[in-house]
UniProtKB/Swiss-Prot annotation:
Organism in which the protein naturally occurs: Danio rerio (Zebrafish)
Official protein name in the record: F-BAR domain only protein 1
Membrane-topology descriptor: Peripheral membrane protein
Keywords of this entry: Coated pit, Coiled coil, Endocytosis, Membrane
Classification via Pfam families: GMIP-like_FCH, muHD
Role played: May function in an early step of clathrin-mediated endocytosis. May regulate Bmp signaling by regulating clathrin-mediated endocytosis of Bmp receptors.
Stretches the record annotates as Disordered: 475-537
Amino acid sequence: MIHFFHTLQGEKNAGFDVLYHNMKHGQIATKELAEFVRERAAIEETYSKSMSKLAKMASNGSPLGTFAPMWDVFRVSSDKLALCHLELMRKMNDLIRDINKYSDEQVKIHRKTKEEAIGTLESVQSLQVQNGHLQKTREGYHSKCVELERLRKEGVPQKELEKAELKCKKAAESFAGSIEKFNRAGGDFEQKMSESAQKFQDIEEAHLRQMKLLIKGYSHSIEDTHVQVGQVHEEFKQNVENIGIENLIQKFTEQKGTGKERPEGPVGFEEYLSSLASENSKKSRAKAFRIPGLGKRDKEPDSTVHVYFLQNNSPLEVDDEGFVIRADVKQNDIEKEGNFYSSDSDFDDEEPKKFHIQIRPVASSNRSNSAANEQELKATVGALTLPPNRVVSVKKQLSRRSEGEGESVPQRVIAKVEVCACRLSSTASGSDALFGPPLESAFKSHSFSGREQLQNAFAASEFFSKFYSSSLENVEDSGLDSPSHQPLGVSPDPTGWAAWPSSQSQSKDSINAASQSRGGSNRPTPSPNPAPSSQSNTEWMNDIIREGPYSQIMQDSSERLALAPPRSVRSKRSSVAITRKNSDFSRSLCSSPLPDPNASTCVLYSKMLNCAPAGLSRGPSPISLSAQESWPVAAAITEYINAYFRGGEHNRCLVKITGDLTMSFPAGITRIFTANPNAPVLSFRLVNISRVDHFLPNQKLLYSDPSQSDPDTKDFWFNMQALTLHLQREAELNPQASYYNVALLKYQASSQDPSRAPLLLSAECQRSGTVTRVSLDYHCCPATAPATQLTSVQVLLPLDHSATDLQCQPPAAWNAEERRLLWKLDDLSSVSGSGTLCASWQCLEVPRGPAPSLAVQFVGSGASLSGLDVELVGSRYRMSLVKKRFATGKYMAGCSL
C-alpha cells in the first residue's frame, strides 16, 4: 500500500502542508455530499406531492358508470407510489442527518489532529531555517578558502596570510556547526513527519470508508424504493386483472338497480258504483295544477270504499293489544314507511282523514294502573312530532297515512309510543303488558355492554398460541398501505374489492328485505308477545346509531331533540357494541320516576339526552366519530423472565426474557373501520429495543421496513383491511365484549449481565455430617427495577425425603406431601428489597448428592424488564393506556458447597 511519508517528502519539505490541506478538503466533500442528498430529497418530495395530487384526481373521478370502481385502483396505486417516494425522502433526510453528524465528528477530529501536529510543523520550520543557515555557512567557507588560495599565489606577507588562514578556519567551524544542527533538525523532522503522515493517512482512510458507507446507504435506499415501486406496479396489474368485467357490471347493478318487480298485468273493466259517486267527487278535490297519475288519490284506492266493504263483508278482528286488524295492507305501504318525505302535489290541500284506534290493554289485576296507562298513552300520542325538517301536525300526518296503510299506521304509532313510555317508567306493574318489553330487551340481540359487563382492559388478554411464521425474522415490506387512504378492496385477492359494499347500498337492501318480510301477508297474525314493539325499539336505536345523532346532539338545539327518530334498517354489519356511556344513559332513563301524564315524554327525553356527552362509548377508551378527535387504542406489554444464578455468586447468571405485545381496540372502533374503508393507517413504534435479540411479528396484520437504520427503534404499521376483518370475526364470536385484544408480536432477549435481573440471588449450602444448612441472600437490582415493586414473592426449597428436624429463619410453610419449604415475602423494592433466608435440617444418612436449588417466584407491573416501550405514530389515533407487567418463568439459584 502507498504511504504518504514515502511520497510526500519533496522539495522544501512541503509534504506536511499538502497533507494538512487535504484533510481540510474532506470537510468540503462532506458538505457537498449533504447538499447533493438534500437536493435528491427535495426532488422525491416534489414527486410524492405530485403523485398525491394524482391520487386525489383519481378519487375525484366520476362515480357514475360501470368504470367507477376502477378509479379506486388508480387511487390506491398512486397513493402507494406517493408513499414510496415519501419514504425515500424520509430515508434521504435520515442520511443527511448521518452526514451532518459525521461532519461534526470530522471537525472535532481535525481540530484534535491540528493540535497534535503542531510539533511537526515546528520541526518543518526549524529544518527550513537550518537549511538556510547551512547554505550561508557553506558559501562563506568556500569564499574564505578561495581568498586564502589567492593570497598564497600572490605571495602576500606572512601576517596577512595568517589572518586569511584564521578567517578560513572560523568559517570551517561555522560550516561544521551548521551541518550538525541541520542533521539534528532533519532527524527530528523525519520522526515527527513519519508520525504525522501516518495520522493523516489513517484519517483519510477512515474518511473514505465513511463516505463509501454513506454512499452505500444512499444506493440501498434508492434500490429499496425501486423494489417497492415494482411491487406496487405488480399489485396494480394484479388488481386490474382481478376486477373483471362481470364484477364491474354486478357492482353497478347492486348499487343502481331499481328492483325486479314487473308492472301489473292487464287491467280489467270496473263497474260504475252510483252510490259512491258523490263521495268520489268530494274526494277528487285537489290543487289547480296537478299532473294526472302522480297524486296520492290516483295511486291509492279510496279508503271510504275500503271501509265500506270491510264493514259489510267481513267482521272486525281485534288482536291481543286491542288494535283493529284490517283485511288488506298495500304492498307500497312499506315503501311509505321507509320514506318520511312525500312529493305528492296535493298533500297540503287534503282534509284530515279520521280513523279510530281502539285500545284494549291486557287484563291486569290492578285496573287503576290500566286506566292510568291509557291516559299516559293518550298524552304521549299527543306529544309526538314528525321527523326532522317536516313541520306538519301529528294529526295530519296520521290521517294522511291512514288513507291507504290500514292497520300499519297505528301499529307504528304505538311502537313509537312504546319506546318513549318504556324509557319513562319501569316501575309500573302494567307497563310491560301495555308498552311491550323495556328498552334493555331491545338490545339482547346486539353487542350491548352495561357497566357490570365492563372488565379490566387486559384482564382477559389472550395471545395467539402460534403465529404465522416459524422463524424469528422481520416482517417483509410488502403492503405499502397508504397512511391516508386504505384501499377499498384493491388487493391481489379477486374477491377483495367486492367484499366491502357501501353502507348505503347495504342499508337499501336491508330496507327492501325488511319491507318484504313485513308486507308479505295481507293480514298479520296476532301474537301474544308484542314483536312489532320490540322490533321497533331495536330498529329505532339502530337508526340512532347509524345516523350518528350523538355527534350532532350537542350542536343542535333542543327543538331538534324533540323530533321523532327516523326509521331504521336492521343490517348484519350495523350492530354496534355500545359501552358504558349508553349503558348509563339507558339505565338513567329507565329508572326515572313516572312523570305527570300530561307532560311531554319526548321533551323529557330530550332533556335527559342533552345531559349525555357526544360520542359512542364511555368506557376505558371513548370513541367519537368526529374528524377532529383521535381514536383511542390501548397496549399491553407482558414479559416473562427466566434466570439461573450459579452457586454463591449473584454476578454469575444467565437471563432470558420473552415478551408479548398486545393491542386492545374498543368495540366501537370496529364499526368505524367497517363504515370507513379509507380509515387512516394505524402505525406504532417500538423504542428502546437495543437489548432485544429477536422479533416475531404477526405477518398477517403488520408491515415493517427491514431497512431501518436506527438500532434503538422499529416502526410497524397495520394492514387495515386484515385488521378490520379480524375485529369483525372477534365481534361475531363475542358480541358482548367491550374491547377486543389483538396479539401483535413476540420478542426475546438474552444476556449474562446480572443487572438485567430484577432480583439478585446468592445461595450457599454447608454440610456437616448429616446436618445440612442452606442460606439465600437476595436483594433487588436498582438498575433494573428503580420504579417498580416485586409482589407475591415466594421462595421454594425442595428437600430430601429423609429430612427431619427442620429449622427455618424466618419461618416457612412446610408442605409434607411435596416435601418443600415455602417462604412468602413482603413486597420488594429497590429501597427495601434485601434479606437472607436460612434453613437447616438433618438427614438419616450423610448426603452425597448435589446441593439443592431454590426457586423464586414474583410478579411486577408498571415497567418492562427489557426496557421496551411502544408509542403511536401520527395524530389520528391516541394511546389511552400502556400496561406493562412481568412475571417469573424459571427463576433458579444454585447452591455452592
